[in-house]
Amino acid sequence: MPFIPHTEDDVRLMLDTIGVESIDALFDEIPAELNTHPILESVPKPQSEAATLRLQSARAREGDGRLNFIGAGAYEHHIPAAVWELVTRGEFYSAYTPYQAEASQGILQTIYEFQSMMAGLMGMDLSNASLYDGATALAEAVLMAVRANPAPRGSTPRVIMPATVHPAYREVVQTMVRHQGIELVEPSFCAKRGGVAVSALNLYADEPVQALVIAQPNFFGQLEDVDFLTNWAHKRGALVIGVVNPVAMALLKPPAAWGEKGADIACGEGQPLGVPLSFGGPYLGFLSCRQALARQMPGRIVGRTLDQEGKEGFVLTLQAREQHIRRAKATSNICTNQGLLSIAATIHMAMLGPEGLKNVALTCHRRTQQLWQRLALLEGVERCFEGPFFHEVAIKLSKPAEEVLTCLSGVNIAGGYAVGRRYPGMENVLLVCCTETKERSDLDHYADALGLIMSEQGSAA
């Protein structure tokens, strides 16, 4: 946005008025070691608008034609052109929070439809109007579960979050609960199946537990034994939180049908539903639950009602939020949601329909199966884990994954995610994702390129 910068005289006048010697003095509470952090020195100097445009255009061209096989929480799907053509209409794009219900019926109804679709996809009774992203949705689900299922007096609330849950999600949850007296425990995964290790889980069999988090599919792309895990948790009085891929739920058993009683809360990342990758955001989180937990649900909820004349209307309801009640009594201190992106997800799901979304999920799975069948024939490549997967597969290489990715990048292929970045000891493991955006020729190209790299002697580099 064009602006006229402050002159030196303007700055001096403002500093003198507030009694401060210099601009740096305004920030003297920041420790010196943070002000001289190496990452700050790497930030480039300001550039003109024209120079910035040239730089960004050049970087955009670098990505042209690159085949993307990276997943690990953010997935490349085809988005019908009509989705963002509609989302960017002024009525959606620039509208603010619909506090005034009588003037916001269109947006309120659209959000209500989002809630209905997500609740239906999860098999749950209700959904909220979205949260920031999948990680914060899981964090809110954990807080929600601890409120609904408090620990015995005198004991610390405990939530089991296995190592198969996305590591970034675990970090965010840890950040949000660290100072709220909640203990997070992370049982390890089974080296054979890539799912939650039952032996590690049973270490807490006789301990009070408030909730168990189950990722489906998990970070490695593997499908967990959700029925066993759900029954294990409920038998011990713990609530079950499912953190799931919404596209996968069109094909797999929904959280509400897990085990004998079903999961209590379902959450996850809604980015696969019509939201571009966009360098990691903005995305949207979703959160749904059973009716019994409705009062613990954070975030906005749109309800449908009748006015005094009997006409249908939509309103914000159950607003137990920090901007409406005392902060200490609020269910959440996240004071906004991703309304625009939830509208995109609504339009995307409406355009695909139940069968269309199921076909997308099925195509993703088939493409990944086909890719693995090709990769299985290569020298120095094997499955890291046994058992079923959805649209990501972890493969073990005879060379370091980072080096292999560098070589693949040289032939314009984003080859996957190096698992060793997050899991020490798995430096040779590559997580490869394949969605409906890939054709058979793309799979062949990837397999041929990887095969050539793996057949070379010595280092992949």
Swiss-Prot record:
Keywords attached to this entry: Oxidoreductase
GO molecular function, one term: glycine dehydrogenase (decarboxylating) activity
Gene3D superfamilies xrefs: Aspartate Aminotransferase, domain 1, Type I PLP-dependent aspartate aminotransferase-like (Major domain)
Pfam families in UniProt: GDC-P (PF02347)
Domain of life: Bacteria
Protein's UniProt keywords contain Oxidoreductase: yes
Catalytic activity: N(6)-[(R)-lipoyl]-L-lysyl-[glycine-cleavage complex H protein] + glycine + H(+) = N(6)-[(R)-S(8)-aminomethyldihydrolipoyl]-L-lysyl-[glycine-cleavage complex H protein] + CO2
EC number per UniProt: 1.4.4.2
A GO BP annotation: nucleoside metabolic process
Keyword Oxidoreductase set for record: yes
Family of this protein: Belongs to the GcvP family. N-terminal subunit subfamily.
Function (record text): The glycine cleavage system catalyzes the degradation of glycine. The P protein binds the alpha-amino group of glycine through its pyridoxal phosphate cofactor; CO(2) is released and the remaining methylamine moiety is then transferred to the lipoamide cofactor of the H protein.
Name of this protein: Probable glycine dehydrogenase (decarboxylating) subunit 1
